[in-house]
């Protein structure tokens, strides 16, 4: 029977310390090998918090499934800032609609949206919470523009 360990690790920088070591040690698997594989699989997400699922089949056999980082982490990376404002009236960054679409495409399978436009709308809402503007506009202004069809040409190109 396989054991499953789920953890949130720093992309490309996982260590044998908590949370991985204490969870994997009792299973008898080579923790160093698991950590090395996680770091290899998450190196492109360097420094971002990444959810991983480790499926330990035996002492020598394991699989690793890498999830997508939280939407907020992807947006903060796109904006080049470390944390959101915490206040919807203060803005910490500004990203382009293309960057919002990029994040929506990455997160698409994890969202409840039925199409790219509604996925983008969800991401725009998160931008507002973090204090990130889109093309110089607030999230509310962008939501109105989305609803009126102002950005539809961008979604037609992606279909």
UniProtKB/Swiss-Prot annotation:
Gene Ontology cellular component terms for the protein in this record: large ribosomal subunit
GO terms classed as biological process: translation
Keywords per UniProt: Ribonucleoprotein, Ribosomal protein, RNA-binding, rRNA-binding
A single GO molecular function term of this UniProt record: structural constituent of ribosome
SMART domains: RL11
Source organism superkingdom: Archaea
InterPro entries: Ribosomal_uL11, Ribosomal_uL11_C, Ribosomal_uL11_C_sf, Ribosomal_uL11_N, Ribosomal_uL11_N_sf
Subunit structure: Part of the ribosomal stalk of the 50S ribosomal subunit. Interacts with L10 and the large rRNA to form the base of the stalk. L10 forms an elongated spine to which L12 dimers bind in a sequential fashion forming a multimeric L10(L12)X complex.
Functional description taken from the UniProt entry: Forms part of the ribosomal stalk which helps the ribosome interact with GTP-bound translation factors.
Protein family according to the UniProt entry: Belongs to the universal ribosomal protein uL11 family.
UniProt xrefs under PANTHER family: 60S RIBOSOMAL PROTEIN L12, LARGE RIBOSOMAL SUBUNIT PROTEIN UL11M
Protein name, entry field: Large ribosomal subunit protein uL11
